């Protein structure tokens, strides 16, 4: 028995996902390990956020309007995210975004009961865009490029493990109804994000590139740095590899926004399933993704991006067709939709993020990420209102729209080139 345990422990230590944490101490390991402080409360809330608004009289069109308004605000914050990441450092900017964008916003969500408070909370949450750029830089800038897919896999795993807490929210909703349970969860979310901010302060350090950029921009004004985007934009538009990676990111950003916002309404209002099931769908999704990421992901050659991405997008399209063809009350087909979507996400999510980062100039990563993020949100912003309007006409239409998006992404993926071997090979 002792020999078997020792052998199992040795195999665990030799697993590529364990090795990537051992080879990348400091920021990557710290940020991966504290990600559940965001992931647990977020996934407890995720199935019920739209219903929380709907139960308090917020209409489909108002939900879509909130999405579109906040996307416009997110564009503004995204532009400044790159500048603040350079001037204040990746670490401090990450902390700033976590505190204002999550800890503060969640307190407002906890007391929201009308359109204006929900809009205020959503706008406050836009501060989170400031730290998106900084967080990605803090995570990967001191990491080895060949480890990026596995690092992003760990980020996904951190969120997936948190999903197994989701049944608790389902049980409480069944006992006490949506509104009071979600209010308490938002308050707890605020507390965990305060803790995450403090841990980041204690255990993370500024990256080497962050120190260089902070020194280079110390004397530069914010407005001067904004003006420098005029030189970055033409360079970005001339880089076909980056443009293709950005196109895929934009398409998937919109598709994720649509499915996250309207799935709960679709299965409860159109298919007639109980809202108590909403907490269990993410568990199936997480279980499938975890099995895939831990047991299969590392067996796929790290240098291969195009084929896994294309297969993942095809699976997304198949999943949407299953959902659209599901008759009322068909729990089994909804579970099949979740299962296939999870396989698709496990293939797509780590690779699309790693592909984009490997395409960027490391010296300008912060501002390029900020520019790309702002562009992604700007291009996506009209679709919040559009899909809200489509849902008000027929709750199937947002998912028909998603099907078109996945087919378009497959066309783009067919034209990308693999990243350089020295960056991707394990």
Regions from the language model: what does each represent?
Residues 123-159:
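Cytoplasmic helix-loop-helix junction between adjacent transmembrane helices
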Residues 13-73, 241-282:
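Helix-loop boundary and gating motifs at the non-cytosolic
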Residues 92-107, 307-322:
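Structural signature of the two symmetry-related core transmembrane helices
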Residues 78-89, 174, 292-305, 391:
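Helix-to-loop junctions at the C-terminal end of transmembrane segments
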Residues 152-170, 373-383:
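Glycine-rich segments within core transmembrane alpha-helices of 12-TM secondary carriers
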Residues 2-25, 206-246:
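Juxtamembrane intracellular "pre-TM" segments in multi-pass secondary transporters
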Residues 199-216, 414-425:
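Helix-loop junctions on the cytosolic side of multi-pass membrane transporters
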Residues 36, 105, 116-130, 331-347:
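Hydrophobic core of transmembrane alpha-helices in multi-pass small-molecule transporters
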